[in-house]
Amino acid sequence: MVASDEFRRVFGSFDQDGDGKISATELRLCVKASLGEDMPDEEVQALMALADTDGDGLLDEEEFVRLVTEMEADGDEEEDDDDETCRCLREAFAMYEMEGRGCITPLSLKLMLSKLGTHLDVAECQAMICRFDMNGDGVLTFDEFKTMMMA
C-alpha cells in the first residue's frame, strides 16, 4: 500500500532519536515543524492516548500508521461534504502549477508569488514547499497543496 509506505517514511522522520517510537515531545515538535504551529498539550496527550494501544506512552510505527490512516479517513468524509471548496482549491492549484508537471515546483511558486507582489527567491519557495511536502519529492501535489491551504 503506497499510503502506508508514505506514513512509514513520515514516522521515520518523526522518530528523531531513532528508537522506533514517537514520544509526545517528538510528536509535538514534528507537528510544529510540519504545520508551523504548536499543538496544545491536551491535543498531543489525546492523540497519544487514542493511538497508544499497548499503553507504553509511546507510538510505535504500527500505532502511528493506524492513527494517521484513521485521521485521513475522517478527513476524507469531511472533504466529500465540501465540493465547492475543493473546486476553488483546484482552480488555485492550477494557477500555481505553471510548468505542466501537475505539481507546484519552487520555480512555479516563485513566479506566481511574484505576480501577486511577493518576491521570494527559489530557496525561500523550496522552504515553503518543504513544510507540506509529505512524500519528500520537492514539489507539492494537489493533496499536499490542499493540506497547506486548509492548515
UniProtKB/Swiss-Prot annotation:
Pfam family membership, one: EF-hand_8
InterPro entries per record: EF-hand-dom_pair, EF_Hand_1_Ca_BS, EF_hand_dom, EF_hand_pair_protein_CML-like
Keyword Cytoplasm on entry: no
Positions with a binding annotation for Ca(2+) 1: D15, D17, D19, K21, E26
GO terms for MF: calcium ion binding
Annotated positions binding Ca(2+) 2: D52, D54, D56, E63
Residues annotated as binding Ca(2+) 3: D133, N135, D137, E144
Highest taxon in the source lineage: Eukaryota
Domain EF-hand: residue ranges: 2-37, 39-74, 84-119, 120-151
CDD domains: EFh (cd00051)
Keyword Disulfide bond attached: no
Disulfide bonds, paired cysteine numbers: none
Keyword set, alphabetical order: Calcium, Metal-binding, Repeat
PANTHER family according to UniProt: EF-HAND CALCIUM-BINDING DOMAIN CONTAINING PROTEIN (PTHR10891)
Entry function: Potential calcium sensor.
Record-given protein name: Putative calcium-binding protein CML23
Organism annotation: Oryza sativa subsp. japonica (Rice)
Classification of source organism: Eukaryota, Viridiplantae, Streptophyta, Embryophyta, Tracheophyta
